[in-house]
Design a protein with these regions (language model features):
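Short, charge-dense linear interaction motifs
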Residues: 1-244
Length: 244
């Protein structure tokens, strides 16, 4: 066909035009996506815990389970009375169910056979206290010798500290982090001779609560220190702005 070269040339020209349009559009979109500023703001607060929990455990041994239980019940009363004498309210004290364990002595005879001999029962019970009187519970946890001196086999755990107004504190930190991020973005835009456009995206990090001036590591899911009465909380906000 005589018109074949003309048709081929026309198709080729059309392909060049289409390619130019596609590439031009892609370049424009790429520039639009890159014409943004991403900044991260930080909000921090230091605070003092207003709630404390503390627990301990006491136990009795006996070959007779009833005897061990009666002795444990007497210990429980002594502990409860002592705590009340220290100003602890009855509704702040919780006793767990009694744990019962059979104890055995193990030995090996001359022929290498293992033997077990019943060595009695061990009954134990856990006591837990939750209170807003932080200093008072701290003092009790440090003076468990008062309980031990009454002939009770008692072991104490370290207190744990919490903050009941954490939700409100978190809102304040989010506001501070957002303000910090926006100020950073405005400074970057100004220094580059641009204007800060609309907010495209905001991402909030997890709250991290550590002891002040500690070397505790942040974790992906958030850190929550319960061993320090004084705490420092932090949260990050990542903002992405369009640049005009």
């Amino acid at each position: 066909m005589k018109n074949t070269p003309v048709i081929i040339a026309s198709i080729a020209s059309l392909g060049i035009v289409i390619s130019s349009v596609v590439l031009g559009s892609a370049f424009k979109n790429r520039n639009q996506s890159e014409n943004t500023i991403s900044v991260t703001g930080l909000g921090t607060k230091q605070f003092t815990s207003d709630l404390i929990t503390w627990s301990g455990r006491f136990s009795r041994d006996s070959y007779e389970i009833k005897e061990a239980y009666n002795a444990l019940a007497q210990d429980r009363k002594v502990i409860f009375d002592y705590l009340q004498s220290q100003g602890i309210k009855p509704n702040e004290v919780v006793f767990s169910a009694v744990d019962i364990e059979k104890k055995y002595n193990y030995s090996t005879d001359n022929e290498g056979n293992s033997r077990s001999t019943f060595a009695g029962y061990e009954l134990s019970q856990k006591i837990s206290i939750e209170s807003k009187e932080v200093t008072k519970i701290e003092n009790i946890s440090r003076n468990i010798t008062e309980i031990i001196n009454k002939g009770i086999e008692f072991t104490s755990s370290s207190p744990q500290y919490f903050y009941t107004k954490l939700a409100g504190l978190k809102q304040e930190m989010i506001a501070d982090a957002t303000k910090d991020a926006k100020e950073r973005a405005e400074k970057i835009a100004k220094n580059s001779g641009s204007g800060l456009g609309k907010l495209k995206k905001a991402t909030m990090g997890v709250i991290q609560i550590t002891a002040p001036n500690s070397d505790e590591d942040y974790s992906y899911g958030g850190t929550f220190n319960t061993h320090s009465k004084e705490k420092e909380a932090s949260i990050t906000i990542k903002l992405e702005y369009q640049v005009d």
